[in-house]
């Protein structure tokens, strides 16, 4: 007489995956989760990470670039920082790691990587304008986010990187950052700011904006701006080359995009953006 079989341990056994989700997790090397605010984008990114770790023998990183820092809450964690934090997943075949991008630390890492020598590195890191831009400027995280994604893919530490982005319009800004960085190094403004000192000052002095800025901010501040961009331009070659590689990564066939939305008209419109 056969013995009754025991019921599965639902607390630890992984529920079956939808076929499309299984294909997404199985074939992708990077998944970028986008959508309007308040529809569950962060929760979806976290759920995909847990599912990938449970059902596949993959090393998974879920990386949040959302300044609201909701990923830690979605996973029941006290906090996330700029370091990678292992997360225990029941019945996992693979592993799950979480991290949040700290903008200032990521910029500092990028400068240390690309500066041509220690002297320029130290001058940039000590520059007051640099500190302000990387700590307070609303779009300062856009480019370093894509750098961090590239690092995660190239490190060889992870088989799948899942990215929790800010609400849709901010996500578009992040994904467009490599192209904008390349354009910036070719811009007339950068050439003007980094021209030889005498010709730069003569040119600036003739422009109404800089005449007003000089009166309000002072010549010293304008000089600091010019110094910062002159130093930053010494890193043009490695940063532009890196931006091109990041752009290629974002359009790679192994990179997938998931748009999360709700049936609300406002959310649908935002998701379509």
Regions found by a protein language model. Name each.
Residues 2-32, 39, 44-252, 256-263, ...:
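Flexible phosphate-sensing "switch/lid" loops adjacent to ATP/NTP-binding sites
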């Amino acid at each position: 007489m056969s013995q009754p079989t025991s019921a599965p341990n639902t607390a630890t056994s992984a529920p079956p995956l939808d076929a499309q989700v299984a294909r997404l997790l199985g074939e992708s090397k990077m998944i970028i989760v986008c959508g309007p605010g308040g529809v569950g984008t962060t929760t979806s990114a976290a759920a995909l990470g847990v599912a990938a770790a449970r059902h596949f023998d993959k090393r998974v990183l879920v990386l949040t670039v959302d300044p609201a820092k909701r990923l830690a809450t979605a996973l029941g964690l006290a906090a996330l920082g700029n370091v990678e934090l292992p997360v225990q997943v029941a019945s996992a075949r693979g592993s799950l790691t979480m991290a949040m991008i700290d903008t200032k630390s990521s910029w500092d890492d990028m400068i240390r990587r690309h500066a041509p020598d220690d002297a320029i590195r130290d001058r940039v890191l000590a520059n007051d304008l640099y500190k302000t831009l990387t700590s307070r400027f609303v779009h300062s995280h856009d480019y370093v986010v894509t750098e961090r994604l590239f690092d995660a893919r190239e490190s060889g530490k992870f088989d799948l990187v899942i990215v929790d982005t800010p609400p849709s319009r901010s996500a578009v800004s992040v994904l467009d950052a490599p192209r904008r960085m390349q354009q910036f190094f070719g811009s007339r403004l950068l050439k003007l700011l980094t021209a030889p000192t005498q010709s730069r000052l003569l040119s600036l002095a003739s422009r109404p904006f800089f005449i007003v800025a000089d009166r309000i901010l002072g010549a010293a501040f304008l000089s600091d701006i010019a110094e910062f961009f002159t130093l930053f331009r010494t890193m043009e070659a490695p940063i532009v080359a890196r931006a091109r590689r990041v752009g290629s990564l974002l359009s790679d066939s192994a990179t997938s995009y998931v748009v999360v939305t709700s049936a609300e008209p406002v959310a649908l419109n935002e998701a379509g953006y």
